[in-house]
A protein has these predicted regions:
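Left-handed beta-helix
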Residues: 1-97
Length: 97
């Protein structure tokens, strides 16, 4: 993907331009918009991350899904998720946490 820096793992996901995925970070089954930064050891699973979002080290966004019912975690534009924060599946976050 143009302009992305991927040092972690990305599976079944869509990345826009200028996304940074740090070493040890995992992104699965998610959509990550432009300028987002996923820091070291963060896990993103079944989530939509809007533009210019920073996900801190060790944060957990969304959850692995099983069965036919899916819950997507959504992070709004220009927010910061602090280190080690958990955002559960189905939550919509539109301010810093």
């Amino acid at each position: 993907v143009s302009g992305c820096e991927i040092e972690g793992t990305v599976e079944n996901s869509i990345l826009s331009h200028d996304v940074k995925i740090a070493e040890g970070a995992v992104v699965r089954n998610s959509i990550i918009y432009a300028g987002a930064e996923i820091e070291k050891n963060a896990v993103i699973d079944h989530a939509i991350i809007d533009e210019n979002v920073k996900v801190g080290k060790g944060a957990k966004i969304g959850a692995e899904q099983k069965g036919s019912s899916l819950s997507i975690a959504v992070l709004g534009r220009d927010i910061t998720v602090s280190d080690n924060t958990v955002v559960e599946a189905g939550k919509i976050i539109d301010e810093n946490v």
